[in-house]
Amino acid sequence: MSNCELTVLKPAEVKLSPRDREGIINPMYDCQPAGAQYAGIGIKDCIPLVHGGQGCTMFVRLLFAQHFKENFDVASTSLHEESAVFGGAKRVEEGVLVLARRYPNLRVIPIITTCSTEVIGDDIEGTINVCNRALATEFPERKIHLAPVHTPSLKGSHVTGYAECVKSVFKTISDAHGKGQPSGKLNVFPGWVNPGDVVLLKRYFKEMGVDANIYMDTEDFDSPMLPNKSIETHGRTTVEDIADSANALGTLALARYEGATTGDLLQKTFQVPNHLVNTPYGIKNTDDMLRKIAEVTGKEIPESLVKERGIALDALADLAHMFFANKKVAIFGHPDLVLGLAQFCLEV
């Protein structure tokens, strides 16, 4: 043995810094009716009817107006104490007839429930049957689709409310029209995205030569200021587009939690194949989407999009390390948005 001394190492010390604040403070967390209303305003000639108090409509419209800087039509049954005690079915019947009389081009009314109307147990499906008979008597030449949308705020969020409204509207309209001749089109459910995202998706499909219907088409929510601009802003998705979804070549759902259930409905009811990919944020998710489009439609990915991909990769290789090296990221948002952004963070 040498004269070396045995050194006993002290155990490592871990110091925890006190947290002065929470990671999330007062997060944006809206109720189901808010998401249902956003889905409804994405349809042309559609006015959502919220069966509840005025606040369930007023504050949501304010949220949309502040974000998009546009005006939107959303109606309310203005439920009060009497209806809360004795039932509010009559308010729905009155609201539907008032909308039909005031808007001659109206074709879709999603009837969106709230906490109060779900708790008191209003029979929305039965009320819709009464409304349909009244509409047939007063407006025999018109067809207005009434879709029941059950969105109590005591569960879920605006994300689940959006998905529920889309599914109910598609079920109501597609069941009324049935399946026709194959259209060769592609159904696309991008989920809760902004107008610029819809414009970009349309360009992708145009570059690939794919005829696609995007649900819900909110491109006009960022419409230019033109002389003939309407006071109210509406979506571009028409009743014919929704009815034609049953005849599509396939469905591409870009949001697992904001439209995929409607794709499942079309597959189960009309045998339209449903394909699910992540929302195309970042290189990998966009690659997956374009490959799936090519697989379903038989179209090739054009050189123009391959070049764009190369430019994006070059930018990441040149600059990403300068901004993202050794950085920590916190992501909070819609589930599909978080999945997409998390994948992008892994890429850089």
Swiss-Prot record:
<keyword id="KW-0411">Iron-sulfur</keyword>
<comment type="similarity">
    <text>Belongs to the NifD/NifK/NifE/NifN family.</text>
</comment>
<dbReference type="GO" id="GO:0016163">
    <property type="term" value="F:nitrogenase activity"/>
</dbReference>
<dbReference type="InterPro" id="IPR000510">
    <property type="entry name" value="Nase/OxRdtase_comp1"/>
</dbReference>
<dbReference type="GO" id="GO:0046872">
    <property type="term" value="F:metal ion binding"/>
</dbReference>
<dbReference type="GO" id="GO:0005524">
    <property type="term" value="F:ATP binding"/>
</dbReference>
<feature type="binding site">
    <location>
        <position position="56"/>
    </location>
    <ligand>
        <name>[8Fe-7S] cluster</name>
    </ligand>
</feature>
<keyword id="KW-0535">Nitrogen fixation</keyword>
<keyword id="KW-0547">Nucleotide-binding</keyword>
<protein>
    <recommendedName>
        <fullName>Nitrogenase vanadium-iron protein beta chain</fullName>
        <ecNumber>1.18.6.1</ecNumber>
    </recommendedName>
</protein>
<feature type="binding site">
    <location>
        <position position="31"/>
    </location>
    <ligand>
        <name>[8Fe-7S] cluster</name>
    </ligand>
</feature>
<dbReference type="InterPro" id="IPR000318">
    <property type="entry name" value="Nase_comp1_CS"/>
</dbReference>
<keyword id="KW-0408">Iron</keyword>
<dbReference type="GO" id="GO:0051536">
    <property type="term" value="F:iron-sulfur cluster binding"/>
</dbReference>
<feature type="binding site">
    <location>
        <position position="153"/>
    </location>
    <ligand>
        <name>[8Fe-7S] cluster</name>
    </ligand>
</feature>
<comment type="function">
    <text>This vanadium-iron protein is part of the nitrogenase complex that catalyzes the key enzymatic reactions in nitrogen fixation.</text>
</comment>
<dbReference type="InterPro" id="IPR050152">
    <property type="entry name" value="ChlB/BchB/BchZ"/>
</dbReference>
<keyword id="KW-0067">ATP-binding</keyword>
<keyword id="KW-0560">Oxidoreductase</keyword>
<dbReference type="GO" id="GO:0009399">
    <property type="term" value="P:nitrogen fixation"/>
</dbReference>
<keyword id="KW-0479">Metal-binding</keyword>
<feature type="binding site">
    <location>
        <position position="115"/>
    </location>
    <ligand>
        <name>[8Fe-7S] cluster</name>
    </ligand>
</feature>
<dbReference type="Pfam" id="PF00148">
    <property type="entry name" value="Oxidored_nitro"/>
</dbReference>
<comment type="subunit">
    <text>Hexamer of two alpha, two beta, and two delta chains.</text>
</comment>
